[in-house]
Amino acid sequence: MPEKMSLRLVPHLACIIFILEIQFRIADSNDPCPHNQGIDEDIAESILGDWPANVDLTSVKRSHKCYVTCILQYYNIVTTSGEIFLDKYYDTGVIDELAVAPKINRCRYEFRMETDYCSRIFAIFNCLRQEILTKS
């Protein structure tokens, strides 16, 4: 009897292993910096601080989009699931939540159909930066 039961479990176990393998592959593909040992903060601040106006998103290489996304993750602004967390900046008064939150929501909505994680995060951040640059 135990042999029959264990034989019936084999297809179920194979299915579970297959699903887990797919989950891990998806999780790995969403991490723009899986081998990153840290960020050079001077370079990161330079990239984020000297943002050019009117960036053509199609001309930016995916590797740069992923690097910017990695920087945003390093500073805990973005999660690997794409959530944007600015609470610490709101709480300290660095960013005015009432002014910025609607812009973030508009930018997030504008690029909601982008399926590539790095491209979506980069586009949202670029959109927000353009909003800020045009108002400055």
Curated annotation (Swiss-Prot):
GO cellular component, one term: extracellular space
Effect of D87N: In strain: Canton-S, KY02010G20, KY02073G20 and KY02013G20
Species lineage: Eukaryota, Metazoa, Ecdysozoa, Arthropoda, Hexapoda
Protein name: General odorant-binding protein 57d
Pfam hit, one: PBP_GOBP
GN (gene name): Obp57d
Documented effect of changing T58I: In strain: Canton-S, KY02010G20, KY02013G20 and KY02073G20
Molecular function GO labels: odorant binding
Role according to the record: Present in the aqueous fluid surrounding olfactory sensory dendrites and are thought to aid in the capture and transport of hydrophobic odorants into and through this fluid.
Record-level GO BP terms: response to odorant; sensory perception of chemical stimulus; sensory perception of smell
Keywords, ordered alphabetically: Disulfide bond, Olfaction, Sensory transduction, Signal, Transport
